[in-house]
């Protein structure tokens, strides 16, 4: 089965997880992937004898939900999640969505009557006014990057962990120079600031040096972004993130608070290459088959993440009990030509049979040319 669906990503603080689970159960959504993450912010700590406070990083546990929904109900479902979790309160999390092309062996069973009643259907969607910047680096480097972006005040970074495969397998003894454990950091920023953020990240993480990491960006709809970059005592009737959210609503966008200037943008802009995201979710043996198939057809690197597959459909719960299974996500960033080769090879295999629950999603991403030009690989190793 091939179709276009929307993927809603919701990063939820651990304290609002129960409210989010109840909301997803009310909507009877059949396919949700969940994994652990953390949100990083700044906190000012008082020193002994009232000396000048010290600023340090504060980590808050969170869960990252990837929710598959029909595109027509995307806006209504996001709004219902926001209201159910009171997500607009600073520090609770963020939510965004994008449209993907999905390939799956078994069809989805959405309760469209319930979605129509609770969320409503619309063909009009908000603009893709934000960018998701995803940075894959060696474990231990993420704190410095998070601190740098927090100082700019554009968003609260989201961090989760994975492992790199592909490139290391081809290096022989040299593979010891590239750690297998990876940190994946997400920054959800206004599109007007995306280029400036990338300019900060690339030299700090040495992403223009082969083997140091990988970065890509994709445009998303983000009705709520976590702007509580600094924690501390509340000194006024409204917090700074509440003031910013109100001004965004009044002005109709976040462009008024862009960090960079529009002047001379053409001469200073980063050159990017249009690439494709190829994300496969399945059981461990299915992921290994897909990875080998992709590598055999030109993909040079991938990142693996452990996920939990959930169904919030009451019928599934009654038939199979609590539907919750361990899964793996294998994500590859590659050229459109390599993507076509991978899809042709999949079509000739039995990976997506009638009983298979694995899924493959593809979508457009942009990669800075300085990374691809300097790296010996075209993908995220």
Residue ranges and their predicted role:
Residues 1-381:
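Positively charged, small/polar-rich N-terminal and surface patches that mediate targeting and assembly
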């Amino acid at each position: 089965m091939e179709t276009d669906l929307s993927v809603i990503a919701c990063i939820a603080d651990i304290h609002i997880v129960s409210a989010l689970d109840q909301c997803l159960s009310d909507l009877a959504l059949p396919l949700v992937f969940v994994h652990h993450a953390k949100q990083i912010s700044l906190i000012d700590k008082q020193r002994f004898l009232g000396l000048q406070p010290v600023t340090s990083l504060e980590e808050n546990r969170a869960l990252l939900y990837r929710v598959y929904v029909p595109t027509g109900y995307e806006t209504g479902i996001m709004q219902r999640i926001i209201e159910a979790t009171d997500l607009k309160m600073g520090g609770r999390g963020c939510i965004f969505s994008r449209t993907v092309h999905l390939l799956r062996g078994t069809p989805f069973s959405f309760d469209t009557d319930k979605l129509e009643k609770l969320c409503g259907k619309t063909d009009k969607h908000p603009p893709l006014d934000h960018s998701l910047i995803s940075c894959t680096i060696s474990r231990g480097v993420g704190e410095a990057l998070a601190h740098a972006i927090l100082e700019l005040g554009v968003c609260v970074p989201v961090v989760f962990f994975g492992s790199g495969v592909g490139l290391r397998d081809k290096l022989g003894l040299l593979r010891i120079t590239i750690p297998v454990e990876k940190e994946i950091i997400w920054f959800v920023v206004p599109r007007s600031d995306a280029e400036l953020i990338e300019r900060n990240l690339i030299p700090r993480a040495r992403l223009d040096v082969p083997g140091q990491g990988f970065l890509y960006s994709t445009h998303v709809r983000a009705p709520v972004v976590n702007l509580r970059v600094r924690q501390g005592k509340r000194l006024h009737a409204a917090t700074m993130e509440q003031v910013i959210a109100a001004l965004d609503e009044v002005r109709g966008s976040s462009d008024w608070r862009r960090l960079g200037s529009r002047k001379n943008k053409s001469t200073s802009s980063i050159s990017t290459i249009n690439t494709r995201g190829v994300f496969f979710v399945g059981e461990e043996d299915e992921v290994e088959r897909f990875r080998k198939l992709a590598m055999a057809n030109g993909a040079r690197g991938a990142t693996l993440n452990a996920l939990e597959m959930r169904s919030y459909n009451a019928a599934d719960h009654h038939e199979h009990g609590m539907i919750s299974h361990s899964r793996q996500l294998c994500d590859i960033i590659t050229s459109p030509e390599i993507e076509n080769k991978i899809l042709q090879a999949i079509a000739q295999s039995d990976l997506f049979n009638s009983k298979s629950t694995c899924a493959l999603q593809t979508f457009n991403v942009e990669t800075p040319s300085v990374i691809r030009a300097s790296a010996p690989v075209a993908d995220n190793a």
